[in-house]
């Protein structure tokens, strides 16, 4: 079995008399894509922010890469990458300028073009060399130039390109763990699937990925294991396939059967409500 990279034990978060997270416990293992699913207000984003050291917990124990959250929050920040929302970027700066800005915050140096090529926002070294070939067909040259967004300003990007860029910034410090909070919200179906492939590539390169999502198909496609949260509690934790099999074995049948069941059926069966994307 792979090593635990995150361990959460009896985590509680109170806001006055309201308990947003109610004593949840779970582990995340090296190299997996782990999903936190739940309706709005379930506690998934709060849980993520606590692990990211962005929000204080009320009680409970958390370790990240063997480090105690209470004792080594600064060291934990060095091994994680956190996706910012679009409001966290200067819209008038070029992508290369933004990458260099984040390098300064992390006190590290990377080649902006190499970083952007990881998320398909600029040309690879091979394509940049092809662009200099005097014999390159004009149509092919234009196609390559259109692909290169390194010199574009952030505000000029499409929604999918902005999401890919935000993921690029999480990779600058070569983190062991990447946190993605609703990474495909608002994207069209093709842009969502492109981002899924990027997330899988990042995992395949050795990172562990923690994701929150409203989309059942996304969790089913991406996640090795998921925890379903409802009203601050974990009500199920397993692989998507195992959850679906357990539901079918309980005698569940769809009213209109296309497939026997999917992950969305599991969620509605457990929580009694459909997911809301507000």
Annotate the PLM regions.
Residues 219-221:
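A short, surface-exposed alpha-helical micro-motif characterized by mixed small hydrophobic
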Residues 178-181:
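Catalytic Walker B motif of ABC-type/P-loop ATPase nucleotide-binding domains
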Residues 130-135, 153-157:
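Conserved ABC ATPase signature
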Residues 174:
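Conserved catalytic motifs of ABC-family nucleotide-binding domains
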């Amino acid at each position: 079995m792979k090593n635990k990279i995150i361990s959460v034990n009896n985590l509680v978060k109170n806001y006055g008399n309201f308990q947003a997270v109610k004593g949840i416990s779970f582990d995340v293992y090296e190299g997996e894509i782990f999903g936190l699913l739940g309706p709005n207000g379930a506690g998934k984003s709060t849980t993520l922010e606590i692990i990211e050291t962005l929000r204080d917990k009320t009680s409970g124990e958390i370790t990240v890469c063997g480090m105690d959250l209470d004792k080594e929050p600064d060291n934990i920040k060095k091994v994680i990458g956190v996706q910012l929302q679009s409001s966290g970027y200067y819209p008038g700066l070029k992508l290369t300028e933004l990458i260099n800005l984040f390098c300064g915050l992390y006190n590290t140096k990377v080649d902006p073009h190499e970083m952007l090529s990881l998320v398909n926002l600029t040309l690879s070294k091979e394509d940049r060399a092809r662009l200099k070939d005097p014999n390159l067909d004009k149509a092919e040259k234009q196609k390559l130039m259109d692909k290169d967004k390194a010199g574009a300003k952030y505000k000029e990007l499409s929604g999918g390109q902005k999401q890919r860029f935000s993921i690029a910034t999480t990779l600058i410090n070569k983190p062991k763990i990447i946190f993605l909070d609703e990474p495909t919200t608002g994207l069209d179906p093709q842009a969502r699937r492109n981002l899924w492939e990027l997330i899988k590539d990042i995992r395949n390169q050795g990172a562990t990925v923690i994701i929150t999502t409203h989309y059942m198909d996304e969790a089913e496609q991406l996640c090795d294991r998921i925890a379903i949260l409802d009203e601050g509690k974990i009500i199920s934790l397993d692989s998507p396939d195992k959850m679906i099999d357990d539901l079918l074995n309980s005698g569940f049948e769809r009213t209109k059967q296309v497939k026997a069941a999917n992950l969305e059926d599991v969620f509605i069966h457990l929580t009694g409500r459909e997911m809301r994307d507000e």
